[in-house]
């Protein structure tokens, strides 16, 4: 073994015993390696391993174990014996193994630990492979992981599981289309995000997104705006995932061209019930064959709640004794609102139905869906609108109608916002207004009474659902 003269005295003085012992071991069996000599070299009976040392390169040996024979490198680094496996003798030529042993000794002579050098090289190779794999990851692969996160995770904002409707929006807006429509004829259309599914994530640049927005906004601006918001949340999530981190270039939220192309998501001006339409609407909704859907739609209008908030109502959330309802709120977590007389009677009818599990943690508005609660009440609402000969009004339009119709009773804005679960918009509302339930009830009952009067409905002890 070659030892530089500058280190010779120091090494002999510091680890004299180790070097001498190691040299004796190497001198025990040293022969010039040949193919035939290595073939005949075997493990003696009763031993776990044995070594045959090369006469040409003193740091190279052939180690025989019960399973195989391999070339090994052995030397001294920092005063301690260092041994590394080079490879199986069937995979390495003798001259190549000698060259590798010389290379490893050269590293030691220059003060480098060969084990660390090897680990660094492996890490670099793995890093290059990982980067190569990253560039090949498509949008659809990462999107499926994101959907799984939505199904099993919780929202960082609300600290609760994501709603069924929110997850369904992601699925529908990324659907490739071509499936038979559940209602109507013909195949379904592809969602706005479908054109991105086969795209490598590394190509999801701000310029590409700007061009995508420019195309999609022409025929469906509001849906495209919604799809963009979902896409932006997905990109933010992916940048926090180790396997997707750093793949998507640029910042969509800060890119001028992207922000310029995002369509304005504006609600339709007529997506709201007018007071003169209330009579026709109630008459049609109350005549629906499905009493659960009928009650659901009426409660939605008379509470101003979000569609999923009412759909997720359980019997344990309804307090008939103290006339209150606990609503799972996406802003505050939950809110308590009054259980007004007409709504109370609607729910009483459902509670008395044979299949109701009012004494359990059952859904108020149950259905045959997988979750057990009402999922898609739009079809029932659309039938009622056709029957009433009214223009299309969305389920969210019923929530909008509550806030609009409340102005006829001159209800304070903060009262309506608290009932509907709107985020406080003023400093006083946010920090100082904590209205008791009785005060909310006073105004909420006024709103309900006015709406029912306009609809020509008289409150009785028992409400006729039909």
Swiss-Prot record:
The keyword DNA-binding is assigned to this record? yes
The UniProt entry's coiled-coil ranges are none
Q: List GO molecular-function terms, semicolon-separated.
A: DNA binding; prophage integrase activity
SUPFAM superfamilies associated with the record: DNA breaking-rejoining enzymes (SSF56349)
Top-level lineage group: Bacteria
GO BP: DNA recombination; provirus excision; response to X-ray; symbiont entry into host cell; viral genome integration into host DNA
Residues of the Core-binding (CB) domain: 134-239
Q: Which residues form the active site?
A: 306, 328, 396, 399, 422, 432
Q: What does this protein do?
A: Integrase is necessary for integration of the phage into the host genome by site-specific recombination. In conjunction with excisionase, integrase is also necessary for excision of the prophage from the host genome.
Family from the record: Belongs to the 'phage' integrase family.
Q: What is this protein called?
A: Prophage integrase IntF
Q: Which gene encodes it?
A: intF
